[in-house]
């Protein structure tokens, strides 16, 4: 019996060459709608699917292949006598190859289309044929990815057939695709914060040499439903990105995106080590570098403005893994690309995630992204912060959001002077931040931000000894009154933001 292939593709990349190959191997081709016309126009012998079903397509093409003559030919078990007798009685021929790709719902759902227009890009017949063929993979070769055409041609050329292992892998790819496709549709239609089932749709963006450590395998997947900052970036120079690079890039970009003003942020091991605002990019970088010129070595530097020539010259003086910015001037690129390995990343999108996911053993935690800065700002002390201190406090509060808890940030003139994070005790985080500020700058009249409340007045006492003049913290401790009184004793102003920023 002559073999048959059913072809129905939206993405017609490579399909002419593949169809010609199948014909050359004596395989009869059946096709639908636009694919049929495309093959016919290119002089490929093809049978319209309606000749097989004896039923014209209807409802603007919504119903074409949903027919027993198609799915019977796909799903019948060739080694089951009853199945084959049924096909013969009903004059149904088997189908041996199913080549189908889907309407581009992933892409169209992000476009500026009406709800009704997006609905029309939900494929019904395509996934149904793919799933039928994948279930019957022992008998049917199912191809859902244009990148598989060449490998299948090689298999057929070698043995006039496709191996069991290849068929099984192709079937797995189908269910991988259709589950992601259905997950995207579910997200689109439900539009719920926390639905009964968590269906997320991601696609592999790149393989990685390894994960956080060299013995860990890793890959990077991007969200099919959104164009996030870490999806739509462009690498202009340097080695391939690593797992740790992307983690650090994500944090650095989120920090600089927090500010409308010109901002520079240096990151090491997913922790900000220097953040500053400036009148220009060069000035912002100098201030961020000054915070911690040791930790920045081998780190990542992010900007929310174009990197210019003057800044590029300074950046080229030290070893950096990555520089990420919305753009680079021509002169800056000429300077920075002299170092072949430094990764230059052009990123224009603002962070857009509405949810954060954390994998735990046996489950996933999901929460809203921490996009809120404060609930209310209330000065609770006798002393009031100056206008500059208020600006510095808000600056420090924006930074402390991105430091692992317990977190303290000391700042002055829109520049971090000391960052203390990842400590199990708040006083230890304060000691670290204040010590760094004193060692590097010997600064006085500084401000201090805390990601959570002070359980005791000890942080206030330490702050008073180290030149702190203004503090911002969420409040909520049973000992808030003690902290206020200690501030009053030391003429320190304090603002309650009434919103905690734990980061684990």
Swiss-Prot record:
What GO biological process terms are annotated to this protein in UniProt? 'de novo' IMP biosynthetic process
Which reaction(s) are listed as its catalytic activity?
(6R)-10-formyltetrahydrofolate + 5-amino-1-(5-phospho-beta-D-ribosyl)imidazole-4-carboxamide = 5-formamido-1-(5-phospho-D-ribosyl)imidazole-4-carboxamide + (6S)-5,6,7,8-tetrahydrofolate; IMP + H2O = 5-formamido-1-(5-phospho-D-ribosyl)imidazole-4-carboxamide
PROSITE patterns named in the record: MGS
Q: In which pathway does it act?
A: Purine metabolism; IMP biosynthesis via de novo pathway; 5-formamido-1-(5-phospho-D-ribosyl)imidazole-4-carboxamide from 5-amino-1-(5-phospho-D-ribosyl)imidazole-4-carboxamide (10-formyl THF route): step 1/1; Purine metabolism; IMP biosynthesis via de novo pathway; IMP from 5-formamido-1-(5-phospho-D-ribosyl)imidazole-4-carboxamide: step 1/1
Q: Which residues form the MGS-like domain?
A: 1-144
The cross-references to Pfam families, in alphabetical order and at most eight, read: AICARFT_IMPCHas, MGS
Could you say which EC number(s) this protein's record lists?
2.1.2.3, 3.5.4.10
Question: Organism's domain of life?
Answer: Bacteria
Give the GO cellular component terms, alphabetically. cytosol
Q: Which keywords belong to this entry?
A: Hydrolase, Multifunctional enzyme, Purine biosynthesis, Transferase
Q: Which GO terms describe its molecular function?
A: IMP cyclohydrolase activity; phosphoribosylaminoimidazolecarboxamide formyltransferase activity
Similarity comment: Belongs to the PurH family.
Q: What is known of its domains?
A: The IMP cyclohydrolase activity resides in the N-terminal region.
- Would you tell me the protein name for this molecule? Bifunctional purine biosynthesis protein PurH
Higher taxonomy = Bacteria, Fusobacteriati, Fusobacteriota, Fusobacteriia, Fusobacteriales
